[in-house]
Amino acid sequence: MGYLSCNGESAVAICDTYNWNPRRRSKVPEKRHPPKLRVFNYDELAVATNGFSANNFLGKGSHGRVYKAVLDDGKLLAAVKRTTITTTVGNNNNNVSQVDNEIEILSRVRHRWMVNLIGYCVDHRRKTKLLVVEYMPNGTLHDQLHSRSSLDSRLSSWNRRIKHALQIAIAVHALHTAETQVIHRDIKSCNVLIDGDGNARLADFGLALIGNVDDERLKYTPPAGTLGYLDPSYLAPADLTAKSDVFSFGILLLEIISGREAIDLNYSPSCIVDWAVPLIKRGDYDAICDLKIKNRPYYAVIRKLAVMAARCVRSTAKKRPDMLEVVECLKTVRQLSPAWNKLRRRSEERSENVLAVEEEKEEIHVRIVRGGSRKNRKVSNVTTSVDDVYERLVPEETLPFRRRNFVLRSRSVGAKVGPDPYDGFGDETVVTMRLLIEKERPVTTAAMRLSKSRSVGIVRSHKTASRKRY
């Protein structure tokens, strides 16, 4: 019966209200209610779009023309998709128009990195259906990537490209992990819109399918998508899985990295997969990086991203990663990019006066006189006064033999001084010193008092003279 016994200590531990955290209580998951959609009338949307005028025309979507609309007395900017009602063929209830399909999906799913549905309008008299969605003022990702206009240089930043890729990956992952799975089937740069805050939003759900793979509706829906982004293993309705979206996203990722279109007849090979994957396999990651990117990332960052893109476009669907793995990879890459940039800025600031002036270096010969007393020893052919010299000790890249060279820095002259190979031989030695003439902002360092070395006679500090040489 010892299992049922309890003592005072255990009783106090159980009843200790001081250490009890109310946040640890198991919370009942809240039900996610579908977003409330507004039902507009046709006349209201006609006024908001100036009669669907050409001045309000934004573009053409997968199932209609898109217009800019000003609603609620100018308080709400929206985009209106106008499409014609089509009659279904036969009595097959599974045949749903793209606009009805988009209304069904967007009425169930809502995400901050998606172009969400505000409302809709059905006008049977005019045989027209209209979708009212969020307005994206900065166009498509395709326009920003491939526009030749000098004004469209907004994606010259590597960090911004990675941010857009991560936002779309999160949106696709949210679709795949929704309460009822959604497969987009048409992920491409034209369906990625940029909002007013510079964020990427996934749009156009006309071809998307909602439901389990075993649903009858999905089994009889023929393959669809855009050439260049379409999964090559998706040949029949039964082949559809979430990995088809992964393939399309891999094409989009290669497009973001390289700046090339999915299909470009101006290049050979014209398909971005046939061009990029062999380069990635050879390890030539810089060759696929867009030249328009100003702050090009380091090798390790490009490699990680390029390998993930190559995995996404594998011909076998089962070998592709899921979107959760893609999201985690992009998060890591986005964290690495600022870290590398910060290290690069520090490295550039540190080596600004040492490495950036290598083209303006000069070699002079310094004659060192060893004869006589220490007072008579002197260094000739050096114009810098000892009183004006300040030192900075900068270790170079570690060598395999534990021997290091040191760079002596001054406000006016920098000299690279290494071990003297002729030390101890003869009374006079000619030592070659490489002087680096500074032209940039000097490095701020603490001043140190210098003295002459007993063995060579070159100006050195106590810190340098006392350092062990291996």
UniProtKB/Swiss-Prot annotation:
PROSITE patterns: PROTEIN_KINASE_ATP, PROTEIN_KINASE_DOM, PROTEIN_KINASE_ST. InterPro entries: Kinase-like_dom_sf (IPR011009), Prot_kinase_dom (IPR000719), Protein_kinase_ATP_BS (IPR017441), Ser/Thr_kinase_AS (IPR008271). It comes from the Eukaryota. Keywords: ATP-binding, Kinase, Nucleotide-binding, Phosphoprotein, Receptor, Serine/threonine-protein kinase, Transferase. Signal peptide: none annotated. The modification Phosphothreonine is found at T221, T226. GO terms for molecular function: ATP binding; protein serine kinase activity; protein serine/threonine kinase activity. Residues 52-333 form the Protein kinase domain. The modification Phosphotyrosine is found at Y234. This is Serine/threonine-protein kinase-like protein At1g28390.
